């Protein structure tokens, strides 16, 4: 179309569906179509148009306007002939490339634009008349056939000879300098039915349009007609703009003679799709103009500013929760902003039609910069005339959805390539969204009930629809939109250039995007599924959009020339009218019709060469695999032979007689599609066996023969290269699994390079190759031969196994519960890829499993499964995969291969079994064990363990790290520390990387410490991810160790001297390495960017470990706790990690997920159990679990407290999970007793109680206006049940523990008890938001359950209050100092024999341990230190330890009246002393210890006040200096400068 000079740039670009670049043109001063003239490829690139197809469409539009403008009769330049360039300056001939839209013509310096010929528009250039299709062949005059044809000289394109109506042309140079003529005879062609227009291939391929034809009306005379057609074509484009949105339909120049005169005007727009059109769908990411941290006012109205990272890219203002978040929390488009204005206190307002956004900057200059930038963009927008507010787009689907992690429902709008989320439909109309999710690279996963997940590379979005049908509709629409982002319409546009191919050959649906290659038909998606059911021997189905890599130019040409109309004349020539298939047909009739049409051939006429239909199908399948595809297919599908007419053939490329195509000796172009990989060579083929075994032997009687193998339609094995008949063959459908055999232990006897094929029926055959290259080539070829296309790109080096698998996973929704999904598994390295493949069952979604990050690999025996087949269970974080093979033989092979790939065995850091944080499990396990049990051990990492045990433990970790469980009673701290140091020392490459050692030393030589630390950060950033994460974990652990230097005597200098030889793998005498490691430990906070919350968490865990002995803390800083389910039994116990931010709701969901418990009608509530089950407190879903557990250390018996999950009826506890509040206050008559007794006495009395707000009121009468007593509920705890010793009047009561008293309230029935309890809980947490039942927490995906793979610290959202409360608790514990008496230290030592070998001298200074470590009390006795160390109590369970020797004395001070039990001898190895001596010594120790504790308790009770009792401290009975437990007698060691000094 012609582009007027003043035509708006947006309207001009809309003609080619590229209006999204209008703002880009306007920003560069190109507001009209006339201003865009003169642009080229480079200029468009500089504008930011990166998509090649988009640039070509704009250039084509510019070229069209230039041609029509140059031929304008009002233009003087159009009347003058343009001089032809000299022969020596003629541009080079373009070389055609497959599926290239335009070929840029380069030449001497001219003013032409890319794609235009220098002779274009000259009067001396002419072209041949194009024959019009007509029903009967009419004789053409000799004058027309022999007329000289003038055109632009083009390079002959033999690939597209079927479209060349002239053949090769001989160029003849004329003496006139302004013309060049090329003449060639035009052979008479078989006319078509109007579906294909024979065009010049140069015109179609390069977009060059020849002008000026002898015998045709003059261009200037027909200008009015062309203009009318162009205007009508534009209107048609406007009407079909939405239907063709996204497709690059390149228009041909407005030459009316190119179009068939038999076509009507309304059909013109349908023929504008070129066979060589292109499609590009790329979104250009804008560069932010402004970005930074700002404070944003919360919309809740409580005047709270939230820290947000804000970006402005010229089109929209986005704010994020963090600068690393991929998705924003809100998007404000520029078109929705009315104005911006600044206000006081460094704030500025962004005003929209719906809301005013308030941001606060750090300075006035920053505020002015934001305001001026936004205001200038607003002015530019108004000058350019953008609508405000913007017109909402027409999305594919809209509706309200629930988003996990979002309080209210969101309004979702699905557009091509993007899913937009808005707060409401009004926000959608204004364009103010939450975030916009690009669908490229995403996947859709349907979950339970009404939920589905959208998996992006950065985050998982979990949605819940209103119903199951809406869920399916959303999932289908999203899946189609995701597939659309992967589509390439280049091949489809070419094939659709034939109008007959724009409708399905079977049902008539529009825009079919599939094709049956051997049948020559283009079909829709629904029919393609039925074609695939026919089998590859009948219909070979390929996608036009997804399988573009296998579409050769010859196949594309075949479909353009043939067309669905010609193919249907062959396949449905005898089909009665009205009996065809309709687009809305159901799968049943559709499949029956397609089977009758193609499998049986009921609707075609008899073929002259193949009377048998099965022979015809075999010939069609063979034709696409042989050379001369076009010739063979057109001969087989020759409908004219049935009608008694002369057969039609495409013209020959040399202009000879049609149908006489020369034979092409080259291999067929379509071999890569039908026969995916053709390969041949010699293989050592063993006979087929029914038993799995090693690779075939190379010598001896059982050595396999060397056969010539050819991989084509089947794997054929010949005796020699020249043998005519194969000895045996294998069909691709017979192969179940391909496996690369592991190298044998003795390569001399067997083939070191071999692979195996497991066949159907439980058979296996081995093949040996001559080398590694041959093995890789054969496995890749065979893998491509029998596997689906989705597996091909994954084949390559490192392939271990490939074959069919059945998959079942709770995360993948199947049509019915327990239904297995069919797919292909590909094992490569340590990754298992699951690919979708057609099969008898529903296809499995594509997925990937990192085997070295698995938590568990197990096999379920056939006796324990309902289908009586073995299942392989892969437990990953957050999900469990069940795999099943086709038979027992391939399942055994898969089990061995996956187990071997998931194991370790290597000495490289990357070869270890990893945790979720990419940290080797051995490092995580050792650090966790030392953190839990060794921080208080004096000389930790300095004292060595038994070398034999350390080597054995390291070998176990390398063999299978996830199966190693470090337990205090079985493993010793010294052995674990030796194992950790040995692991780092024996790595192939040190964790700090040997290639970066010079940079480490260079950084250590810098004079300033700040410079050194910054340089260390740079070097750490250069490390691989696994090295970087492992080093950070190790340094963080050493930082915690040196924080306890007052107890373990291990300062930073000592740790650096010990670990430098292992971390850097040096001799240990290098001063630089020791200095680097020492400064890394000291500067851990700054070097690794540890925030304040994490620092407080580290301090908290160190305080807990050093004060509370029975706590277990992993190196990640989370508390490891035991949670029971329904009953306090060992089998019902689950161990997991509890972070400071974990709520009771999240804990419940995690435990139920770990146990695989399905949600029912009952609610699961977490209870805090005290008094061995007498008191149960239901935790509010929003309560922090760790904050409650920290208070157990104040109990007389901390081991009596635990966590328990119980099912509660919905009617009793349902109100805890809703936001509904009671309209009237809770009031009722209860029987009450308080302790200590004051007003109510020591008996249960009936009183009226009123719950008002956050206070519990005691009323004299029900209608009393003034209460007698009032108790605030802040900090109160309500427990179900009353201690039995108080003899409650009813079994239904609850205990309210206040700050200085206990209140016991008895109810009439259980419902009343639950009503009061839940009302008190809701009153205490009335400011919390209502929770969602059985919804995963926001940190479920990032938090790992406790096993042998702990995680790095997980930072919560609001851990400040939790940490503050925990620190306050710890301060009180430090002041009281009672923990050391209640929790004796557990020590882990070797056996008696090993201690004799490695006996160390007794230290002169006392070894300070907690009270209960008996060596302190008998330091002056004659018993040796090594003997008394064996008597330390070792509880079996760290959290629920048994009664130790000091617990009878604790029961005396208990207020709960626990009975005393006689002391039991502690378990442990036998000592050298006699039993009588040891028994008398124990009795003496117990008596002395009890007298000391009782005397100290009486003394402190007499001196201290009742409100603030002081904690007892045990004096030294032997005259040693009194020492507070946990503190040394001398200050910790300090760093010494010389590196050669021994350890202090």
UniProtKB/Swiss-Prot annotation:
Gene that codes for this? ARAP3
- Tell me where in this chain the Rho-GAP domain is found: 907-1088
User: What post-translational modification information does the record give?
Assistant: Tyrosine phosphorylated at a low basal level. PDGF treatment stimulates phosphorylation. Tyrosine phosphorylation is increased in cells that are in the process of becoming attached to a substrate and that start spreading and flattening.
Q: Where is the composition biased (Polar residues)?
A: 1438-1457
Zinc finger region(s), C4-type: 504-527
- As stated in the Swiss-Prot or TrEMBL entry, residues carrying the post-translational modification Phosphoserine are 1444, 1480
Please tell me, according to the UniProt entry, what happens when changing residue 471 to W: In a colorectal cancer sample; somatic mutation
Instruction: Mark the transmembrane ranges.
Output: none
Please state what the protein is called.
Answer: Arf-GAP with Rho-GAP domain, ANK repeat and PH domain-containing protein 3
Q: Which InterPro entries does this one have?
A: Arf-Rho-GAP_ANK-PH_domain, ARFGAP/RecO, ArfGAP_dom, ArfGAP_dom_sf, PH-like_dom_sf, PH_domain, RA_dom, Rho_GTPase_activation_prot
